[in-house]
Amino acid sequence: MSRVGKSPIALQGAEVKLADGAITVKGPLGTITQAINPLVNVANNDGTLNLSPVDESREANALSGTMRAIIANAVHGVTKGFERKLTLVGVGYRAQAQGDKLNLSLGFSHPVVHQMPEGVKAETPTQTEIVIKGINKQQVGQVAAEVRGYRPPEPYKGKGVRYSDEVVILKETKKK
């Protein structure tokens, strides 16, 4: 059995409902509904969720670990939420959050406007910092990757949009 799939999920103040091959996790920050693979059994025991494969096949074993991680992320998301921090490095690079839009000046001849999907918010504590928050880990990471994709850090000066914990290894310029 999967090592990840064996460990139970503590619900930490989240409500869980199992119905029709789907699990609904409800917490103070919102609600997430996730389809459950038919190769995985989910049992709710007094504040913990236990997952187990239906049979001993490799596929069911692998999916029990995957489903456990997805459900654990949903529980974490509705109780504490997820956030990803981005930093803008470069002269004149700045960001401004306006409602559900993120306006970016990244050295192009035009401003870049990124529309935030539902359930994801962007904040700009300073002009060169962006904090993307939401309850869905996959969505938060996807939006952060899209924003970074507008101007990824270049290897010679390091200018561009980078994750705050990202280390950009700079190359040396060509010598004559």
UniProtKB/Swiss-Prot annotation:
GO cellular component: cytosolic large ribosomal subunit
InterPro entries in UniProt: Ribosomal_uL6-like, Ribosomal_uL6-like_a/b-dom_sf, Ribosomal_uL6_a/b-dom, Ribosomal_uL6_bac-type, Ribosomal_uL6_CS
One family name in Pfam for this protein: Ribosomal_L6
First and last residue of the signal peptide: none
Keyword Ribonucleoprotein: yes
Keywords noted in UniProt: Ribonucleoprotein, Ribosomal protein, RNA-binding, rRNA-binding
Superkingdom of source: Bacteria
Residues annotated as transmembrane: none
Listed GO MF terms: rRNA binding; structural constituent of ribosome
GO BP field: cytoplasmic translation
Subunit structure, interactors included: Part of the 50S ribosomal subunit.
Function: This protein binds to the 23S rRNA, and is important in its secondary structure. It is located near the subunit interface in the base of the L7/L12 stalk, and near the tRNA binding site of the peptidyltransferase center.
Entry similarity comment: Belongs to the universal ribosomal protein uL6 family.
Annotated protein name in UniProt: Large ribosomal subunit protein uL6
Organism name: Burkholderia ambifaria (strain MC40-6)
